Regions:
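GST-like domain detector, emphasizing the conserved glutathione-binding G-site
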Residues: 1-116
């Protein structure tokens, strides 16, 4: 899982779930769907990528690639939607979103990769 150490140290003090995302990003939508499916409370940090809000020095300090989504969970920064989804399902196991059967889980990951 791409857990990164941000240079924007402000996010290290964030408590709870904070999602940096964009309404026009499919990858952001996937993470928002998981947050809602699990019934988790989270704080929205919407970035307008059409106005290039994701390529500012402040955001590069959170995600050096300047991509959305980025999740901050109690100061831990996680990038890449598949890894964020895995983190959420592991950290908040109910309701489970991943099959317990290894073959079914591999098939799920196959379709997740196709859906990007």
């Amino acid at each position: 899982m791409p857990v990164i150490v941000p240079t924007n140290e402000e996010v290290l003090s964030y408590a709870g779930l904070h999602l940096f995302h964009s309404g026009v990003s499919n990858c952001s939508m996937r993470v928002r769907m998981v947050l809602e499916e699990k019934g988790l409370e989270w704080e929205s940090h919407h970035l307008n990528i059409l106005k290039k809000e994701h390529i500012t020095p402040e955001y590069f300090g959170i995600n050096p690639a300047g991509l959305v989504p980025t999740l901050v969970n109690d100061g831990v920064v996680i990038i890449e939607s598949d890894d964020i989804i895995d983190h959420l399902d592991d950290a908040f196991p109910e309701p489970p979103l991943k099959p317990s059967d290894p073959q079914q889980r591999e098939q799920m990951y196959f379709w997740l990769r196709k859906a990007v």
